[in-house]
Amino acid sequence: MSDNQPNQNQNTESDASPVAPRREFLTKAAAVSAGTAGATLMPRAVRGQEPEDGKLELVRIGIVGLGGRGTGALNDTLSINDKVQLVATADIDPAKQNVLGRLERKFGEKVLVKGGKNYVGIDAYKRVLDDPDVDVVLLTTPPGFRPQYLLDAVEAGKHVFAEKPTCIDPAGYRTCLEAHDKAIENGTAIVTGTQYRRQTNYIEAVRRIHGGDIGEIIGMTSRYCSNGIWYRNRKEGMSDTQYQLYNWMHFIWLSGDQIAEQAVHNIDFMNWVMGGPPESAYGSGGRFTRPDDSEMWDSCNVDYLYPGNRLVSFKCRQIPDTKSDNSNIIYGSEGIATVYGINRGAIITDRTGKELWSMKGDIGTAYQQEHKDLVDSIRAGKPIVELKQTAESSLTAVLGRIACYTGQDVKWDFLTEKSELNLFPENFDFNGSRPEPAHAVPGATKLI
């Protein structure tokens, strides 16, 4: 759970303080007791609770966020991995624990938490991080809280699976870089939910592209367009904050807008193909069909300029009754590669259209593979740490959002070196009020 949205009266991309309220709130919300903290500064294998070779036999899992994505992540890791066990959960909503019975019926002894270590509340995540029985924590809350949760998990000595995006503002990006470096120092793993990097047709297509099958990369187009997204009506008795957490996709301080929360998959693929993040972004878009209190735009069109003067034209859209398209087309000096989302596969042709290679896709296996890679790397004593690349992709999405919101040509270096944008509310109160939903206006919304 995390991020904040433009204040219409202030004409800025956020009404939040540019300082660091995210860390201050989360630190105050759940201070670690000295005794527990001392027990969790290092991974369990390092603390001598497992075989001398440092390899974990039973990998014990905790999760923060039991919504749809969290439940999906649990199904994936419990399905693909042997000798794993869910031992602790956290969520702000006690009703979310209803999923545990279904998981127990499906996975049996792999699920131990029913009636056990199930923590509820805004600070419940700390109880999972403080638990010495937890080796791996899955971070699957709305994105706004993710940067600080990541850093706290690493500081608690946990291995981490973190959903995308890992940040939705420059402040969160810097927190992610700090967590990345500390994980390497600690010897703890961080695997992220960018499943295209584990989908076989994507992997093979990129290998061939980088191997020269289409010649020199000239440019690219990418589309992440669908028919809409869920919306939840406010329930009687909810505070402003409770409602926004419940309907989190539609508030920028929590989701980062669709370009960050949803379309980051294609943006991550763009960076993968191009070898890193872009230099700048220039974009436009707007709101046409969203409910009045939704801060999300339903369309963004961004031109990303990558090193070597290579342009990537990116589009994301969520409008009912429109044509869906999830595709990436990479233009080379000698050929063209088209890589489709979900299960449609990939194809490479020469400049005349003659097929040179093709491959079917299977996204289902990719969802599970990321969890297998995480656990395998832990057991092998070679923990994967991939947070930096996902943080860069997440900030690339933020770069596009800010370019659209402000109407300016926004530089990567500005976000990484100068921007003070921090979207987390300065005074977070679970039972309190929030500013009226605000909508960015290009030309009026300012860079921070």
Feature locations, PLM:
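Short catalytic-loop micro-motif centered on adjacent basic/acidic residues
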Residues: 88, 138-139, 160-163, 190-193, ...
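Active-site beta-strand termini and strand-to-loop segments that position acidic
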Residues: 303-308, 331-333
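N-terminal glycine-/serine-/threonine-rich beta1-alpha1-beta2 phosphate-ribose binding loop
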Residues: 2-158, 175-187, 445-448
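Short, solvent-exposed turn/loop segments enriched in Gly/Ser/Thr/Pro and often Arg
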Residues: 93, 120-122, 142-146, 166-168, ...
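ADP-ribose/adenylate-binding Rossmann-like module
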Residues: 157-169
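Predominantly a Rossmann-like dinucleotide-binding segment in NAD(P)-dependent oxidoreductases
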Residues: 65-70, 185-192, 196-294, 320-322, ...
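C-terminal helical cap and adjacent loop that interface with cofactors, partners, or active-site loops
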Residues: 19, 28-36, 47, 72, ...
